[in-house]
Amino acid sequence: MNKKTQLISLAVAIATTLILAGCEITPHKVQRVVTSGVLSGNDPAAAIESLAKERLRSYRNNPHQLITDIEDLRKALRDLRTVAEAIWGEEENTVPSEKKYVKYSDDFHAKAVIDFEQGLLTVATLHDSDDPAQTRQQLQAAIVRTLLTPADLTAVDIFTANEPKGSGKPFLRGQVVDHDKVVVEYEWRANRFAEYLVETKLRKRRAKENDVYEVQIALVDDHKELRKHQYSDYVIAAAKRYDLEPELIYAIIETESSFNPYAVSHANAYGLMQVVAATAGRDVFERIRKIPGQPTSQQLFNPAQNIDIGSAYLYILNTQYLKGVRNANSREYAIVSAYNGGAGNVLKTFSSNRNRAVEIINRRQPGTVYRDLTSSKHPLPESRRYLEKVMYFKQDY
């Protein structure tokens, strides 16, 4: 690894460790941590981890500091994009999103992108050496790593180029079959399939100053259904706990993330139900769990926690913010729209006066309420489309 790559990798590792720990990121703090680690001959990551734990303890005494640190998280995510751009180029600086899993490896010279909406896996490697055979080997290794990435989300850090820790059942188990139409689950089959892909499906293209070697793998046709079943126990439990229809929870998950547990967004929404920690997460902590603060990104990447918190927020919308809406169908339309754009914007669709808005909703038929919430009367175009999508997907469950 050259010096430039080492510095880039170190910078990302530092930022990521602080991100995942929920720490305030400042140039002074990073410099202090790195200098301390280097001068003492210790691993800087150990010092960073210690600093992160110290920061987490401070949240117990001052939970509002977490809001400030979320702003630092946004900056750190922008920095991560900058690092990807520095290595791959402006058109290739892919980062995780709501419906795309993105994992860099091999010092950020390899990446895997799973488009859960399109059902497509792409694995790519930069050809920045004089030996094409070496690049092909690196691509083959990246394919194997991706196919065998464990389902245990705590073993995978999507914000760094670190390899997944641990083993166990693959995250993509059942969703990828090899050239013999057999499910890829074990290392020997993953290696065999990766070798076949590199030999027969390799594509080459340009990115910045280097060639890119890549292969694409289509997920099986029922990949969404398979992912749905992985989380069915959590959905059913949450539905019972919060008096919700399982079909509604499934439809929201499909709309928000296409069942991508690693989903992240520019609005700091995480996981399957795209929970925003500072708003929905804080509401659930304070109103349901009766504790201060808000969930961490680690909690929201946990499928069980994410589904519980997202469902609890639906419960809050249903029993508190929009409880005045009497018709069950109208209230469902209202809470779905509010899950995306807030209860305030739902009510503004009908009147600037909240009490008056509820009265208007109660006088209207559910179909009219739906049309109003999906029309230009609602202040947010995204929320209009969101309600349409959720109700469309709900029919499939």
PLM-predicted stretches and their roles:
Residues 2-10:
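Bacterial N-terminal signal peptides that target proteins for export
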Residues 11-19:
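Bacterial N-terminal signal peptides
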Residues 253-258, 306, 313, 324-355, ...:
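Acidic helix/loop microenvironments that form the catalytic cleft of cell-wall polysaccharide enzymes
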Residues 262-265, 285-287, 348-352:
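Short, solvent-exposed loop/turn and secondary-structure capping segments
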Residues 266-293, 308-316, 364, 390:
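Substrate-binding/active-site groove segments that recognize
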